[in-house]
Amino acid sequence: MMTKYSSNSSSQSFAKIRTKHTSKRASKLFSAMLLIAGAFQSPLAIQTLHAEQPANQLTRAETVAGWKLLFDGSSTQGWRNYKKDALSEGWKVVDGAIVREGNNAGDIITDKKYKYFELSLDYNISKGGNSGLMFHVTEDNPAPWQSGPEVQIQDNIDGHDPQKAGWLYQMFQPYPMRWAGETEIPDATRPPGEWNQLFLRISPRGCEVSMNGVVYYQFRLGDDRWKDLVEKSKFKEFPGFGSAGEGYICLQDHGNKVAFRNIKIRELAEDGSIASPVDGKLELATTLAFPNLQWEGWEPVDEDGTANTPRRTLELTFAPGDAKRLYVMDQSGTIYTFENDPNVQTANVFIDIQDRVSKWNAPGGNEQGLLGLAMHPKFTQNGEFFVCYTKPETHESVISRFRVQADNKLQGDPASEEVLMVVPQPFQNHNGGAIEFGNDGYLYIAFGDGGARNDPQANGQKRSQLLGSILRIDVDKKSDAAAYQIPADNPFVGVDGIRPEIYAYGFRNPWRIAFDRKTGNLWCADVGQDLWEEVNIVKKGGNYGWSVREGAYAFGNRAGGPDAANSIDPVWAYDHAVGKSITGGRVYRSNRIPSLQGKYLYADYVSGGIWALSWEDGAKEAMRNEEVVAGGLPVVAFGEDANGEVYFMIDSGKGQSIHKFMQK
């Protein structure tokens, strides 16, 4: 459902590469010439392009997930020079960063050795500058790079080294992901004067390097490919290179000014796993909500023995004013209805529009099909309901109004379709498509950025079109230009160059939105690309960062627009060691399970975990994250009935797709 990446490591020929470590004298001379010429730009003279978390602090989510600071922004405690007991005077703490700014500063290492870990840091390199991040460093050699593999750090514009920032020196480099349409080697670095975020994972499950949120490459320490690349590099002269199994983290002095901050590390278990990032566990179990339910017109297996397309239920909802009935939407294009009774036997077809809906099980169509259903607040009077689906062939997203049949309110009328909106989609993924009515009576529509990797059309921040946004429209009125009106208090009404339908923007792939019936808060889970999954509280006019930010962190090197500095951070985020594809849920308002009351339930499709999040109005971050299910349940969506009971849905070849929670 939610697209992920796959990658194969790549390297380059080293026959003509000028080695980095033997050119230090030239580097120092070059740096000195820059200083004399007045061309040096301090790495601390930052051009602020994006909203930033306070430096050298952990978010609550990071703390719960096991991250720790290696630098607190005020002291150099925990660091020393290579083969020394203390830190030289060439390294200073300046404005919350540890800065190499003096002569003979020397390479510095952590006091502690690390085996398996994830490391994240921000660096700011001077014009033409060069540095590096090494791992598994031992003190058996004259220089740390003779034992510890190095992730290159340099100014890619004016730097002299052919090994670019983020490359594993003379070993691995990024490569274009051709399946995503990339044709050039990616360079996600930002220029001197701006902070870059470097991420490194060293794990028995596989290692990875990312630059500003973009995965560069993956590798395995010590495998045949690794050994082959070592033999082709200068490191073959050092028998212990990259083979210590553990060692110090090292920041390199290459004779140029460089600054580091937000140096964070999380140690991994021997198998590469992490502890569950939760504040506690709820004593709950799950069960089929309607164990006897059969779907009209659908059987698990055809008469010839062929398995049918599994049930993929993306919406379970109710019509306001009718607590006795549920409406369930299948991604294939069929909506069913049945009594809200655990002993119910049959789900009857409410409407079948498969003839106009693209197939989600077709090649590339996993995030297409019938994606959204919302019953009009006055459905019991006017019989109106709304859907979002993707069209076959053109792959456009369609928002339509339907009505029930005149003589049967339990049957939708396929011929009653009134198209409100058609939105072109450049790719087949990140369609979004969740729709909800707010307490204000307006229809809210969530669209992703249009798909592929890295938001190639910059739709997340491009408000002249509708992708990457949550829209808000009045479906009870029409205008001369459309079959709906724009609410007068929409945030961008009358603003030149911005579509007035936009309520909030900066989303990558909002996989389900939901209103809290008690507070009116709009919750949105946004599926991340390579590092972070988000839970957001959506505010009118808010910019949620994509694609200049992912979660609360920098992404890529695209310049942000005028409002990027005010982007809103998620109230909760988790990294890809926890899960890789968030499924947004709903706030539990039933009285049946007191321990869930008022908590936002969400899941991860890849890890199969389910959690309950506690949050208070006005808080920047969620107060508590509790485990409901440890893993193994690939939840595709959540639903809610008139009583505030929350259900969750998984794919099922047997048709048993709807589940609920229960006390143990």
Q: Where are the model-predicted features located?
A:
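Acidic, Gly/Ser/Thr-rich repeat motifs that build Ca2+-stabilized beta-propeller blades
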Residues: 118, 130-136, 271-454, 512-515, ...
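Bacterial N-terminal signal peptides
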Residues: 30-43
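Beta-propeller blade signature
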Residues: 399-407, 459-475, 538-539
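Short edge-strand/loop segments of extracellular domains
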Residues: 135-158, 214-218, 331-335, 342, ...
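Conserved blade-ending motifs and adjacent loop-strand segments that build the rim/top face
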Residues: 507, 620-642
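Short, conserved, GDST-rich strand-edge loop motifs in beta-rich repeat architectures
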Residues: 446-466, 532-534
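Carbohydrate-interacting regions of secretory-pathway proteins
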Residues: 49-273
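N-terminal secretory signal peptides that target proteins for export/translocation
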Residues: 1-25
